[in-house]
Amino acid sequence: MRVLGLFERGNNLNFADTYVYTWNKQYSFHENAFLISNQVATTIIIYLDKEIVNQVNEAFNLLNSNGIPALIIKSDHIGIFTSSNFTYDWQNKIIYFHEYTYYKNNEFIVSDEFWLNTSIQDLLPYKVLFFERGLRKLYEGEEYILYNTATDDDIIYKYIYEKDVIMSGNDYSKLYDTKSFKNFVHFMRLLRMRFAVPFDQLSNRVTRSRAFAKSKIHIGLRNESIPQALDNIHHYWINYSANGMRVSELKGSGSYSEKKISEFDIGQFKNYMNFLTLMFYIKNMKKKPSCTIIGAAPGYWIPSMKKYFNIVTYDDKHVDSTEHYNRYFTDDDIASVKTNGVYIDVRSDFKNYDWKKRRQLVEEETMRWLSITYKLLENRYVEAVLLKMTAMDIEIPDGYFVHFPTTYRKSEYYLLVDKQTVKRPKIKITKSLAYGAINTIFSDNVFISGKYSLKGKTEGVLALYCLSNTINPKEKVVQYANSFSGTCMTVRLNNTYILNKIIDFKTNADYTFLPSDFQCSIKTVLTSYRGYAGVFGYAITKDLKSDGNNHIYIIPNARDDDNFDTFASHLGLSRYSHSKRFSESATTMSGYLFRDMVSGKENMEDTDTENLASGHVFNAIAHYRFDYTYDIVGWLKLHKMRKFRVKSNIYGEHTDDEIRNAIEAAYVYYLLDGDEVGKEYAKRIMEIWDVQTWG
């Protein structure tokens, strides 16, 4: 949903699902905002004049803080605003569109410049374009700035990590005769144009920035947080991602099995991922990361990293780094290293030898660089080293096994060690064990750390999309959330129809939760992604899907004590019931009639004006799968404590009977639907209401 104000009237109705709202001057901006938010159209247009513009702006402020984008636009921008989903930074007047119209211009967009130095351009019938952070500026004026954030990065990543599975599927096989990158891109674009635009992924790139900057401890970071981690690299923070496999954890066996991973060179991708892995590992040591790279050329990714890190390079080819030595690194250079990280990516050219001699030389060279690594870690500056290894029988420190995909899978992997690691007993690793790992394990996350413990203080913690994991007992997660005082945490919403549903994934599983599971502080807001966006200064156009991958956002200290409606309020709460009522019900008054019938009312003559149950409470419970932005748990507690405050002239306090009747009506609604999860939710909401004493 989006609300657009226009000063110029024009042919603005030639858009599907658009409604022109007539501002009611008899109503306050609160009531107008409420009526606007509950329209079922996806685009609401309001024609403005000088008489109403101030009131409209007040309503727009309220809508935006509730995560519903509302702004005055230029009339010649009406097309893109009505046809594209976007995330609106209403604090800074920046609109981030998430749309792929550039496909009609035969463009392929990437956000990492090193892709321009590969053969991608030769393999595709599109023009490959680079925009830093994927931000393509469309317009800049006094009113606002427009960007498009859509890229094809995700297609490249899926190609690198998932192409074998995708291109072996029946759908792909029926459409294409060959397994090529060109066909893969075409197939993924087909899926995208089939209403599969990754809005959540694109929007999260924007909205997590503010939450990240406010946090000191990050749980469950993954690669999508790289931009925010880089932006805050000089501020204090650490992460707990429970990611990374130590050498001692490797199992299985294998043998040499060369495989071409990509049609185009992804060696730069591998080096970039390795570098970031090392830098963020050192960041977790509470130090400002810096790096010496030995064997850096061509290093196309290095120039973009110079603004975040001091990077010293050694190579006989030129590299655009902070400080470059146009020669090979030797033992004599060890004492002069002043960076706290060293990345060793050296492999001499032994192609003129037969394979036995070549293997001997590769192993000898590996041993030499391992010896240099030990000496580097005796240097008072160096904290950690990431070095290239080869599959061989060897004793090595119990460091982290790092193996990001590169163009060909052969015999190489990387070992991440630090000062403490090399002091512990070494691990014997066989050539067979190494090949088993190389052939089956690919790293996919640059954030390596230990597991986070759900104990202790939670100030400054940000935990997005990670704590539902069955690694932790469900009751411990609930206890943690109840006392959580960090920036924000999420748990997966149970929008299924199975009580206590556990959702399985390839390598793990998630518990599911209901808002009624928690007993958080009264200042904590429980809401949807839309509500979370509003709290952090954003608004989003995309409506929730009832069966989507949805999370409950638990945000401490977000409550506006003077005005509940500022964040996660009832705005937009009735959209689903309106839509269902108009399309499926016997009468548009069915909601009123249903609630009063359950409440035992016999005379229905005034049911639409003097009903016995709260419509807001009923909708929040009965239709939670479709919109759980409204913090019903917080509202009920504040209401009964008589601490509920709202700056509105349309609010009337509900009686105990009105709220009980609404909860009972929601229970009966679910009962008639055979919905066990819904019934349980209504029962728990009633328990929350019962246990709270009147203020």
From Swiss-Prot:
Residues 256-432 are annotated as: 2'-O-methyltransferase activity. Its EC number is 2.7.7.50, 2.1.1.56. GO terms for biological process: viral process. One of its GO terms (molecular function) is RNA binding. InterPro entries: VP3_Rotav. It catalyses: a 5'-end diphospho-ribonucleoside in mRNA + GTP + H(+) = a 5'-end (5'-triphosphoguanosine)-ribonucleoside in mRNA + diphosphate; a 5'-end (5'-triphosphoguanosine)-ribonucleoside in mRNA + S-adenosyl-L-methionine = a 5'-end (N(7)-methyl 5'-triphosphoguanosine)-ribonucleoside in mRNA + S-adenosyl-L-homocysteine. It comes from the Viruses. It is found in: Virion. Its main location: virion. PROSITE patterns: SAM_MT56_VP3. It is an enzyme of class 2 (transferase). Residues 560-695 are annotated as: GTase/RTPase activity. Multifunctional enzyme involved in mRNA capping. Catalyzes the formation of the 5' cap structure on the viral plus-strand transcripts. Specifically binds to GTP and displays guanylyltransferase and methyltransferase activities. Has affinity for ssRNA but not for dsRNA. Capping activity is non-specific and caps RNAs that initiate with either a G or an A residue. Together with VP1 polymerase, forms a VP1-VP3 complex positioned near the channels situated at each of the five-fold vertices of the core. HAMAP family: Rota_VP3. Interacts with VP1. Interacts with VP2. Belongs to the rotavirus VP3 family. This is Protein VP3.
